[in-house]
Amino acid sequence: MKIVSWNVNGLARCRRNGFLKFLADAKPDVLCCQEIKGECPLNVPGYLLFWNPAKRSNYSGTLVLSRRQPLSCQYGLGIDKFDDEGRLITMEYKDYFIVNVYAPNLNTHSSPERLDFRMEWDKVLREFVTKLP
């Protein structure tokens, strides 16, 4: 099985720069994309698409392309303030889970509020993942 994770930094731009060729060449079973920055019309034969865009335009968001139908798919953590940013998709398959995560960024210019947001995100994500069956 081939699983690929890729921060595309904007799917529309990435698509213009060889995204579909990469898929055709690499042939991953699952492709997890982060920072899609909104929905972009995409038809990829042989793949099911699972979108989780941010509510804010041109911001964050995740996408999973899968050759197989998962048993279930969950978007987000179930907490609006985190889920509004489209940062997580959880795919359940028969013998495993795939969790596609685009974690909130922190840098030296981050506000104290954003630091608190990230610290809480990390705690909630850890709890979420450890509770997966």
Residue ranges, per PLM feature:
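N-terminal, active-site-proximal structural segment of metallo-dependent hydrolase catalytic domains
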Residues: 1-44, 54-60
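Short, flexible loop segments at the rims of nucleotide/cofactor-binding pockets, characterized by
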Residues: 6-13, 76-77, 116-119
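Amphipathic coiled-coil/heptad-repeat helices and related helical stalk/stem segments
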Residues: 15-16, 84, 125
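Short linear sequence motif anchored by a di-proline
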Residues: 25-27, 75, 96, 125
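Structured beta-strand-rich core segments of catalytic domains in phosphoester-bond hydrolases
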Residues: 36-38, 42-110
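A long, amphipathic alpha-helix that forms part
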Residues: 115-133
